[in-house]
Amino acid sequence: MLDYKIRAGDTLSKIAKRFNVGVDAIVQCNGIRNPDRIRVGQKLKIPASTTDAMDAVVPSVAPPPPPPDGLDGPPINRGKFVLLPKEYMGEVKKKDLIVLHFTAGTSAKSAFETWKNNPVRVATCYTVDPDGSIYELLDPAHWAFHLGVKGSNGKHDKRSIGIEIANVGPLKIDANKPDQLNWWAREWGTRWYRRDETSKYVPASYRGIDFFAAFPDEQLDAVGQLVRHLCERCEIRRKVPAKAHRGKCDLTRFGKFTGVASHQNFRKDKWDIGPAFDWDRLWL
């Protein structure tokens, strides 16, 4: 067991990565109630291994849930990528659902460039870059089309807040270089990473694809903070689908669901948010 004093800029995921242990192990060893509420100078016990974490003293009674993250929320850039009123629906709607997407691209900027000047008003309220930067494109009180559920007249778009996470999504093995994974741009001809760079992708079979791009820790932390902030601000239930249903499209179930879901729950032809996303990192 090691001692560590938190420094400026630290997050639990960064500390865990530095010492090659799991975030859950640090949380368990230190009785941390809210992983986002750590402070500079705070002392932590760092388990040298998973066994150390399992040997740590665990309270017989589960700790209470973490306190709300607060209405101020995480840092959000509300000036860089802003849609014009003509590019979304201005009516105010009560929200009871958050829907996670990935952009199938490399940046928040590329998503914004696709949506601006688009007369059909397709967009999400937020985008999150790989480095964890969060951008608000329109106030979540309003809405835009982001689900594409046929015959619904935008019913679920109106009640939901869409979050696009910059991630290329599905990957395929290069036809001529079996040690390389490509993403879909240029007909699956754009290099992603080598197959031995295993931190950059997740091997998982889903809807005809066997590999998916990984989400960086900084991005996962930012998405979790944003989701919890929106749940607090908009009074959305802090609930995710059961594991057995996270990858399924079921309009009967998800048409009534309130909480946090993903695009794949509403469309059989969509991969997002996919098997590479770690739902536990939402800390709901």
Range-by-range predicted roles:
Residues 65-75, 91, 169-284:
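Basic/polar, cationic surfaces and motifs that engage anionic cell-wall
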Residues 55-157:
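N-terminal catalytic cores of peptidoglycan-degrading enzymes
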